[in-house]
Amino acid sequence: MKKFRFLSLLVVLALVLSACGGGAPAAEQPAAEAPAAEAQATEAPKEEAAAPAEAAPAADGALEAPMLAAKVAAGELPALAERLPAEPKVIGPGVLLSEESLPDWTAGQYQDGSVIRTAHSVADWAPDVFVMLNEPALHAPDLGVQGIKGNVLKDFLVEEDNKVFTFYMREGLKWSDGEPVTTEDVRFTWENIYGNEKLTPAGLKARFRVGNDPKGEPGVLEIIDDYTFKITYPSPYGSFLRNLVIEGWNGYTELINPAHVLKKWHTDFTPIEELKEELTKNNLTEEWWTLFGQKWCQNWDVTRERCIGYPTVNPWVLQASDSPATKIFERNPYYFKVDVEGKQLPYIDKIVSQQVEDVEAVNLKVLTGEVDFLRESTGLVKVPLYKENEEKGGFNTVLLDMHVDSSTIFLNQTFDNPVWQQLSQDVRFRKALSHAINRDEIIESIYYGFAGYPMKSVGEENSTYDVEQANALLDELGMTEKDADGFRLGPDGEPFSILVEHGAHAPDLEPIAELLAEQMKDIGINFQIKRIDSQLWGQRNDANELQATIFWAHDQNGDNDRLMGNLGLFGRQWNTWFTTGGAEGVEPPAWVKEALDRNKARWESVAGEEQYNALAEEGYAWQQANIPQITIVEDVKYPMIASKRLRNVPSAGYAIACNFAGEQLWYGE
């Protein structure tokens, strides 16, 4: 086994030196947003790059894909100039990905019939494709928050101490069905969706309230004209723009939705009598709001079968397929981006994602050369197999950075068991489990050395492997008695175990869980590992039925949606209390409220300024003092699979950032 690990390590080292430019250092966590300049101008600031006044012809003279040119010639589509906005988003070096991540960006060429093949393991959900399709309202390179520019929205202006935000839309921007995108789509979203108690009982989302707080003061929308609108807050909301970039994987649908379609299913515009037939088809009577929810496709829904034909502004649009297991996405003829030569993006015609049984089956498709791009289901544990099959499969394994902490133990501290709550809510118990983890063994055997100790999220002291200290802490908690198998009894004298259910969301989670179960025996903790279907895992988590799990975690500094994502796993009922403004769930203890208050203060301040950064450091200190979840490793490398023919594939930075720049991928020879 040691020999195999040594050989595998050599393979991974060779990968780093060859595919990653001689071992470039890992990209840092996205830097905080630069302070927003107090705007003085009365006109909209210009986009970072202007579209050519007259687009320069590409090398082959084509400014649109052959499949679209054929439709124009047949009279099935308007000419390209009529499909693009007056000022398209211009893509070139450093726009979607920084030049540090992609130093050799090149303008691509169309290939008629080009397809990106990928695979997914969850029914009606293709995560790699979702990320490729998701378009935020605003954008910054590398999924960061520095250098925020327009995206779906053309531009913005910030005034009055970060209280007034004016947004400028792209005149001539169209939905994928050819209808114009205007401020009516914004007004409808704000007033008729968020302002309707049936559709949104809690009203405006937290992201549109001061401090990103469900109880914060709401913003006020003002429509200026067909392409200009303003959102005003009663107090500073310095980091509001971050919520329009990519926080929480949100997309433009948080703010802009196709009113011309959705009004058909809304009783403010369509009498309920006209909805009766469709209500009956869906086994509904008067519940028009439920029907509306089924017709409304938000950014998370774009790969779901019910969204076939739904208008979007994404680069590819879901098409009908002969099999529900095969998802086909075809280029959007009205997509709003062009490259520096004037060619409409995306370069590639289609994405096809095939559903298979599980993550292992997804990886099997990689090895047999049936995948052109994959990130979501890869793992370092698979790298030796990837490297062995690269030539045969026609792909490269690109070692990039993971945007999350890849493996974290979440103890659901609100799981409905009094003894469990007593123990899991005591920081000594969480520290004991952390000390029992032999991280060196995990880093060597699972990550081949390409991971580090969780210095930010757990800290040096509590991530040290110290079985003696772990046992002492458990003794302090009254867990001094053991059963015949050497497992500790609970402080009540009854058998004690931790059921760790996981959905095998990534290849490394199951082997890590099994290794942890062995390591926990050294401190007398019965760590029971159970793999369940990933959809069932989500349902059990939502219902507060998971006692514990192993999953990835976002930035551990108590910040924005990342805190909420983690809170939903280490304190499900606390999370419900927060997101419902105290109407449901369980009120969290003071140490959790402290993080929520700091989170609100950070959102009110401007990212990158002194106050914001100081609060971030306080967040790390809070994390290390309380260890709300037990992060196993940080700074993990992430293998991404890309066809040897794909171009504009990054060599550094976050792997997932390549998904978000999928429209600039193209096939070379």
PLM region spans:
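Ligand-site clamp/hinge motif
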Residues: 170, 303-307, 334-385, 517, ...
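Detector for C-terminal structural segments
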Residues: 310, 316, 320-327, 331, ...
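Gly/Pro-rich hinge or "lid" segments in bacterial periplasmic/extracellular proteins
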Residues: 119-144, 249-345, 466-475, 664-668
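Ser/Thr-rich, Proline-interspersed low-complexity disordered segments
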Residues: 12-15, 20-59
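Aromatic- and charge-enriched surface segment that lines or borders ligand/interaction sites
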Residues: 155-200, 230, 362-365, 423-425, ...
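Extracellular/periplasmic solute-recognition and catalytic clefts
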Residues: 193, 197-206, 221-222, 317-328, ...
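N-terminal lobe/hinge region of extracytoplasmic solute-binding protein
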Residues: 73, 78-160
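Surface-exposed binding/hinge segments that line
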Residues: 206-295, 644, 651-652
